[in-house]
UniProtKB/Swiss-Prot annotation:
Name used for this protein in its record: PTS system oligo-beta-mannoside-specific EIIA component
GO CC terms: cytoplasm
Record's comment describing the protein's domains: The PTS EIIA type-3 domain is phosphorylated by phospho-HPr on a histidyl residue. Then, it transfers the phosphoryl group to the PTS EIIB type-3 domain.
Active-site residue list: 83 (tele-phosphohistidine intermediate)
Example of a GO MF term: protein-phosphocysteine-sugar phosphotransferase activity
Domain PTS EIIA type-3: 9-107
Positions where Phosphohistidine occurs in the chain: 83
């Protein structure tokens, strides 16, 4: 996935990009668990990998935001940004939990 540059985006567009990528990742994570339940283990792994790509894109955007702010350009706080941050962080937690669950299922042949 190509890295998006946030330099020409508004704060709202940046927030929506975070929501977009973390939302896509969240969907893949849930689909992964469902695929595993249906016995489609390879598909489950592929969906986790796809989720990680979207989370990587979100992380890149987030990192650019931090770099921008550390360079003296303040980020405007908004409810939308807070929602985007919450969405990203909860999706990261969900990914780690589901990966651990899938590993457990595999080791126990569930």
């Amino acid at each position: 996935m190509e890295q998006m540059k946030i330099t020409n985006l508004t704060d709202e567009q940046i927030s929506f990009q975070l929501i977009l990528h973390s939302g896509n990742a969240r969907s893949c994570i849930i689909q992964s668990l469902r695929a595993y339940k249906e016995g489609k283990k390879d598909e489950a792994d592929a969906l986790i990998a796809k989720a990680e790509q979207d989370l990587s894109a979100a992380h890149d955007i987030h990192f650019q935001m931090i770099q921008k702010e550390s360079g003296g350009e303040a980020t405007a706080f908004s409810l939308l940004l807070m929602h985007a941050e919450d969405h990203l962080m909860s999706t990261l937690s969900m990914k780690e939990l589901v990966k651990e669950m899938l590993d457990l299922f595999k080791t126990k042949n569930i």
